[in-house]
Amino acid sequence: MNVSVLGCGRWGSFLAWYQAAVLKNSVKLWGEAGRKSFEQLKREGKNEYITLDKSIDLTSDLQSAVSSAQVIIISISAQALRSFLPEVTKFDLAGKIFVLCMKGIEEGTGKRLSEVAAECGIDPQNTAVWVGPGHIQDFLK
């Protein structure tokens, strides 16, 4: 399966590693060029918790990450979701499954993040939410 993880902080990089190393999916990990987490992964291939599987395609090309994926995992700040999704929804999303991997509600509206995604054009029928332990260390044990 082709999976893209949008957001390459600790949680996003862990999810990409898990998808590639454990589940053996084909994975693209997207991050914004210039951000500390992306630049560290690009330079070192690792962060303080995981070393990226060599099969992971680390990219700052959002169109490539979205277009190639069957499943799109979003792992960014919950408060950035509404402003980020218009960048995603300008691409063809037909048949793509979205997994929101962030906790919380939208400040100011009190809306669940799945509601925010729907308002931004993500099909609610193709949206799942994955939250778990607050720290990736819990998964690495």
Regions found by a protein language model. Give the residues of each.
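Rossmann-like NAD(P)(H) cofactor-binding subdomain of soluble oxidoreductases
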Residues: 52, 71-141
